[in-house]
Amino acid sequence: MSLVAEAFVSQIAAAEPWPENATLYQQLKGEQILLSDNAASLAVQAFLQMCNLPIKVVCRANAEYMSPSGKVPFIHVGNQVVSELGPIVQFVKAKGHSLSDGLEEVQKAEMKAYMELVNNMLLTAELYLQWCDEATVGEITHARYGSPYPWPLNHILAYQKQWEVKRKMKAIGWGKKTLDQVLEDVDQCCQALSQRLGTQPYFFNKQPTELDALVFGHLYTILTTQLTNDELSEKVKNYSNLLAFCRRIEQHYFEDRGKGRLS
């Protein structure tokens, strides 16, 4: 499809109202999805809740392979399929819904910088823990990732994914990091987020933005995911305002809207 045709389709999609049957796809919640993908999915769910846009969550064993980018979550809205938080934020904005339009340009730049920090530090740490920490790989990751598939496909897919992630880690300079170094990076990230949040309810005072959705998705998932030990979640628990922030969003955007406690 040409760029002109794509732009035309996007304009048509933007003109259509948000449907009641909009769907978000992710892997199987109980036995398959891993920490990083669960965090990404929760971030998108929180963002859509903050925009007051209804979404139905559907779990599929092959969600990763259904996604146009190979990453989850992705949403199916009308005849459009969009994956990952950034593109979903832009897609929703094209439909007239934005959480950050009220920010000044300097604030928008700051918001994007903190989102980059979360993706570069927290997301990368989650991937490292899942695929490079031998205890986690052996006890959790391989079994969960390959759980929907028969032998030997379950092992083949898990080792293939592990190879991809390890190659990425080497490319970004994380290949030789120790677990302690990764946990220290997580602590530094949490410290920066805690200082920016301060005593405010959200990162930019009284109204949430996509940054709040992203941070909530990762921190809440870290706090509620059972791993081989509690070292990762303990880093988050050191910051009381981040804990209160997670509880505030869970209560306001999930419990108060009849969705029940996320955990």
Swiss-Prot record:
Keywords: Acetylation, Membrane, Mitochondrion, Mitochondrion outer membrane, Osteoporosis, Protein transport, Transport. InterPro entries: Glutathione-S-Trfase_C_sf (IPR036282), Glutathione_S-Trfase (IPR040079), Metaxin_GST (IPR033468), Mito_Protein_Transport_Metaxin (IPR050931), Sam37/metaxin_N (IPR019564). CDD domains: GST_C_Metaxin2, GST_N_Metaxin2. One of its GO terms (biological process) is mitochondrion organization. It comes from the Eukaryota. Interacts with MTX1/metaxin-1. Associates with the mitochondrial contact site and cristae organizing system (MICOS) complex, composed of at least MICOS10/MIC10, CHCHD3/MIC19, CHCHD6/MIC25, APOOL/MIC27, IMMT/MIC60, APOO/MIC23/MIC26 and QIL1/MIC13. This complex was also known under the names MINOS or MitOS complex. The MICOS complex associates with mitochondrial outer membrane proteins SAMM50, MTX1 and MTX2 (together described as components of the mitochondrial outer membrane sorting assembly machinery (SAM) complex) and DNAJC11, mitochondrial inner membrane protein TMEM11 and with HSPA9. Belongs to the metaxin family. Involved in transport of proteins into the mitochondrion. This is Metaxin-2. It comes from Homo sapiens (Human).
